[in-house]
Amino acid sequence: MAAISAFISLSLDGCYADANSDMSWAHSQDPEQAEFTSSNAKGGGRLIFGRVTYEMMKPFWTGPQAAQMMPDVAVGMNAMPKTVFSRSLTSSDWRNTRIATEDFVSELEAIRAGDLDASIHGSGSIVAQAATAGMLDELQVMLVPVTLGGGKRLFDGIPRAISWRREDVRQFSNGNVFVRYRPG
């Protein structure tokens, strides 16, 4: 059975995007964090995105900038199978990308029944839905030392409390802190 994990950057006030859906505040990396991110992203498996994150990621990872900045990661991002949850997209020209057509939980159950572990990147609403459905095996948070004063909060509106057990913590010189959690 495949595991489903999620990686998301959060502000100190719990937002994954500001009030204008901007996430540029989350992209400052020092060399140590860049190496960590690169090695973390090289793993195989399946990627899961919501439409908004997909539309942000596709032009970068299929373009020349990604190939120059992070060639190994770009190769992996383009080669790995990808599932995109969207109510408006019907097709994709990004290699190995499938638009989810079944209901959310059925799609995640099918992914878990497969052989490839899957990782949700960004896509805050998808992360919250997967956690609420009990389908998230691991939550990786990059805590960024900024307060946004408003925006899209990761777990706003979830119907019940979810307990998490900390598995790992890593601090970077730029002030970012990576925390790995499991349900429990």
Predicted stretch roles:
Residues A2-M135, P145-G184:
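Portal/gating segments that form or line small-molecule/metal binding sites
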Residues M142:
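Non-cysteine beta-strand/loop elements that form the S-adenosyl-L-methionine
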